[in-house]
UniProtKB/Swiss-Prot annotation:
Family classification: Belongs to the class-II aminoacyl-tRNA synthetase family. Type 1 subfamily.
Protein name: Aspartate--tRNA(Asp/Asn) ligase
Claim: Metal-binding is one of the keywords in the record: no
Segments for region (Aspartate): 197-200
Chemical reaction(s) catalysed: tRNA(Asx) + L-aspartate + ATP = L-aspartyl-tRNA(Asx) + AMP + diphosphate
Length: 594
């Protein structure tokens, strides 16, 4: 071993011991010929002092030290002189009086100082330096503890950890695949899996009964600020269970995870129906740390002469004290709405005397003006924001406005935790809505799956898949924490006939379903058990636990929001020879024979 002790674990009780430490120079200070360094390793920091004037060789070496040199130091642990203790660090009562010094690796001029802020792109380009800093390193170490805690819970319940393939067949699952040319089969491609969904279902058919995996997943999505092309899930599947069983295990996992940061999740976690969440909060990922619920106004304005409110849906959200906002701020709300694809955000100001002002108020009837504040629960001094139009998009705008209002008014306690299960979502959604939202619709039909094509309908809706498609409810559940969906799952279809009916609704005829999912349909013919599961977004979950806004902070080597790795400069072009060898331009054999 190149060291005998961890620097950050030395204490007063170690005084008098001869130790060998190894790590990096966090700081170097020269005080009249006596040199001090803060030596940092994974355990923390210890002060090392070079003060022996007789040992000129060691002193000369110490004079050469600069920040981030990697060194090994031998010496004796001593109590610091009176008045020199540092209560800011765990080792602040001691120091190591060095007797030898070995430079293990010199450090070039740093691209940024590790104790100063740096831009994200620079941090990612030199991520190996960024991870020497306390907060980034702590986030990665927390992730390891999170993994271990989840594994411990699942081991207690006899889950089997199984690795599924990471190169497989391209199957439509709701996003674009990353494709990998198969050199030995020119013109054919593997795909990186968007999830282990199909394989974990096959494992249930295989009799594994309880499976889990900390799985890498890949989706070729459009660039978004806080998405990664590769991400991690805690993936679980169970046989002979219903939704209640899966929710119970999931709550046990979550309880164990949040215990790592000293918080006890009250269980059972409350539940809300999807339809109720959309009606009250405008989203299926409601942040319940604050109120400000949406108010339905469609019936209130049913006879309105104001053309903007002659819409399928009219809703409102109240901003407490918002009537005092200057005109420039109110105009800024319009820009805020336009950035989200809407024409604007109508508003009414409630004056201190209860009269209504703003551009909308003059278009309302006397009866509407008289009853509006009471209907939406507004008080003098408040601002009422409205959205009118299609139900889903109008509610979504108000839901976003609700969160924006809470942020601007400081209504969200950053130390609070609010968990909720969102249950009973629709099984299908219009395919055009899915594609407009940037998703990839499975099949060519008018409907596509809200979650994925393998989600089972609630048993009472099974007979109405074709006759009342838009109303069918899924036997599915999402877990939401502080407005973030951190996991989602469902009971799965385990019968071939039902799976084929669901495919048909989505525009996959029997021949196409057989071509793309024949292996799954065939497996269902061999005594497939009822089964279901859940997958947790492991990056987001860990980021919440670490108190980080971005998932990039809990990924060792993340990509930027544009999908680029500044460290390795990926993605990168390939050579002409690589392209030729890959067979990427070849026609597959079955096409050549046709």
């Amino acid at each position: 071993m190149l060291r005998s002790h961890a620097a950050g674990l030395l204490r007063e009780g170690d005084a008098g011991q001869q130790v060998t430490l190894a790590g990096w120079v966090a700081r170097r200070r020269d005080h009249g010929g006596v040199i001090f360094i803060d030596l940092r390793d994974a355990s923390g920091i210890a002060q090392v002092v070079f003060r022996d004037p007789q040992d000129t060789e060691v002193l000369a070496q110490a004079h050469r030290l600069r920040a981030e040199f990697c060194v090994s130091v031998a010496g004796v642990v001593e109590i610091r002189p009176e008045g020199n203790a540092n209560p800011e660090i765990a080792t602040g009562e001691i120091e190591v009086n060095a007797t030898s010094l070995t430079v293990l690796g010199e450090c070039a001029p740093l691209p940024f100082q590790l104790d100063e802020p740096a831009g994200e792109e620079l941090r990612l380009k030199y991520r190996y330096l960024d991870l020497r800093r306390d907060d980034p390193a702590a986030a990665i170490r927390l992730r390891s503890r999170v993994n271990a805690a989840a594994r411990a819970v699942l081991a207690r319940h006899d889950f089997v950890e199984i690795e599924t393939p990471t190169i497989t067949r391209s199957t439509p699952e709701g996003a674009r695949d990353f494709l990998v040319p198969a050199r030995l089969h020119p013109g054919s491609f593997y795909a990186l899996p968007q999830s282990p969904q199909l394989f974990k279902q096959l494992l249930m058919v295989a009799g594994m009964e309880r499976y889990y995996q900390i799985a890498r997943c890949y989706r070729d999505e459009d660039f978004r600020a806080d998405r990664q092309p590769e991400f991690t899930q805690l993936d679980m599947e169970m046989s002979f269970v219903d939704a209640e069983d899966i929710i119970a295990i999931s709550e046990e996992v979550l309880t164990e995870l949040w215990a790592l940061i000293g918080y006890r999740i009250p269980t059972p976690i409350p539940r809300i129906g999807y339809a109720e969440a959309m009606r009250r909060f405008g989203t299926d990922k409601p942040d319940l740390r604050f109120g400000l619920e949406l108010v339905e106004c469609t019936d209130f304005f049913s006879d309105t002469t104001f053309r903007v409110f002659q819409a399928p849906y009219v809703g409102a959200v109240v901003m407490p004290g918002g009537a005092s906002q200057p005109r420039r701020t109110l105009d800024g709300w319009q820009d805020w709405a336009k950035q989200r694809g809407h024409r604007g955000l109508a508003y009414v100001l409630v004056a201190e005397d209860g009269t209504l002002g703003g551009p909308v108020a003059k278009n309302l009837t006397e009866a509407e003006r008289t009853g509006l504040a009471d209907h939406v629960g507004a008080k003098p001094g408040d601002c009422i924001f409205f959205s009118a139009g299609p139900v889903k998009s109008s509610r979504a705008l108000l839901g976003a406005a609700r969160v924006e209002i809470a942020n601007r008014l400081g209504l969200i306690d950053p130390d609070a935790w609010a968990f909720v299960w969102v249950v009973d979502p629709p099984l299908f959604e219009p395919a055009d809505e899915a594609t407009a939202a940037g998703e990839v619709a499975v099949g060519s039909g008018a409907w596509t799956a809200v979650h994925h094509a393998f989600t089972a309908p609630k048993p009472e809706w099974e007979d109405r898949i074709e006759s009342d498609t838009g109303s069918v409810l899924a036997d599915a559940y999402d877990i939401v924490c502080n407005g973030h969906e951190i996991g989602g799952g469902s009971v799965r279809i385990h019968r071939r006939d039902i799976q084929e009916r669901v495919f048909a609704v989505m525009g996959l005829d029997k021949a196409e379903a057989e071509e793309k999912f024949g292996f799954l349909l065939e497996a269902f013919m061999f005594g497939a058990p009822p089964h279901g599961g859940i997958a947790f977004g492991w990056d987001r979950t860990t980021a919440l636990l670490a108190g980080m806004d971005s998932i990039r902070e809990v990924i060792a080597f993340p990509k930027t929001g544009g999908g680029v790795d500044p460290l390795t400069d990926a993605p990168a072009p390939i050579t002409a020879q690589q392209r030729k060898e890959s067979g990427i331009d070849a026609q597959p054999k079955r096409v050549q024979q046709a």
